[in-house]
């Protein structure tokens, strides 16, 4: 992609790891992002936590397993993961490690099914917006918060948007029909999708 296009990238989000305590010993932990895992690993509880884990995304799974954690289920997005819990694990207690800008999918699904859970804010996400001129031909988005950050000082305009998953795409669809969603929540696949699009 870089050989054929001018590529500009910047961190649209600043992540601040937060100290946390566990309100109740869970049967299972749930991680929806790598940032939640990094906060968990920075906490002393990571050295003694032995309960099985469910997570969203292959890279989240890899980070957990690289640090000795047992992942029993990986989903492409939180809605898929909650559906799995509702069907197979309704009588368990879950702890969701998340950020301050989390989407309501986990809590809504658990409440709807009457499943016991707690949520811990393990990190804070701060938006870092920057004006982009000229208007890019393509925009790669990795989270709904990234979309929100970009829109603080920019508009989608005629740019083609590439989203890492359906959750991120949901934040973009009201704004444009020029949209491609990565087949999996994987950064390399997203870049490949953009490269393929602009080689046409």
Where are these regions (language model features)?
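Signature of uroporphyrinogen-III synthase
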Residues: 1-200
């Amino acid at each position: 992609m870089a050989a054929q296009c001018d590529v500009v990238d910047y961190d649209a989000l600043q992540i601040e790891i937060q100290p946390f305590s566990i309100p109740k010993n869970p049967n299972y932990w749930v991680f929806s992002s790598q940032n939640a895992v990094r906060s968990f690993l920075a906490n002393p509880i990571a050295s003694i936590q032995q309960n099985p884990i469910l997570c969203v995304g292959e890279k989240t799974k890899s980070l957990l397993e690289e640090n000795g954690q047992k992942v029993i289920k990986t989903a492409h997005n939180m809605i898929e993961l909650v559906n799995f819990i509702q069907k197979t694990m309704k009588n368990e207690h879950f702890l969701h490690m998340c950020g301050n800008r989390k989407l309501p999918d986990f809590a809504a699904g658990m409440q709807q099914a009457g499943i016991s859970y707690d949520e811990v804010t393990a990190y804070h996400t701060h938006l870092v917006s920057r004006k982009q001129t000229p208007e890019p031909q393509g925009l790669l988005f990795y989270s709904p918060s990234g979309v929100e950050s970009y829109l603080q000082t920019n508009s989608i305009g005629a740019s083609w948007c590439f989203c890492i998953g359906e959750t991120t795409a949901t934040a973009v669809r009201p704004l444009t029909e020029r949209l491609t969603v990565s087949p999996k929540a994987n950064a390399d696949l997203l870049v490949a999708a953009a490269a393929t699009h602009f080689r046409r």
